[in-house]
Amino acid sequence: MRFIPTRYHAPLDYIVGVVLIAAPWIFQFSDNSGPTVVSIVLGAGLIAYSLITDYELGVWKIAPMAVHNLIDIVAGAFLAASPWIFDFADDGAKVWAPFLVVGAAAIFLGLTTKQTGGYRYRKGGAHPTAAAG
């Protein structure tokens, strides 16, 4: 069931993107290149695909929200699994826990955020239920 409006999802994307980029220094694992690269690349990627998403805080509004949600699910699974994929799961919880927690949260948001809403409907587009009612 999708119950999270895009207006709440959109700001979280940018906040989490910045946190992922800063995570190596926040959680003090910047001396470990594997998790540092994964965190920075996925944080920058999240910001990049948020900029092209057709939602409230998208700049270019190219990608539909359904595509954004799918990317969230795939990226979240990759993020959660990355401590084992890149062999840094034994480096301590301060290194692997942020990847697991943020990855699980991304999967949750991808599965529960509405596929439509927000921007398009405030700009005069027809709401999907308006045609049916």
Spans of model-derived segments:
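Juxtamembrane loop-transmembrane helix junctions in multi-pass integral membrane proteins
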Residues: 1-7, 30-34, 56-66, 90-93
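Membrane-helix boundary elements
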Residues: 16-36
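Hydrophobic alpha-helical membrane segments
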Residues: 68-83
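Small-residue-rich transmembrane alpha-helices that serve as helix-helix interface/gating elements
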Residues: 97-108
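Intrinsic N-terminal pre-sequences and regulatory tails
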Residues: 1-11, 116-133
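A low-complexity, Ser/Thr/Gly/Pro-enriched, surface-exposed linker/loop concept
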Residues: 35-68, 108, 112-121
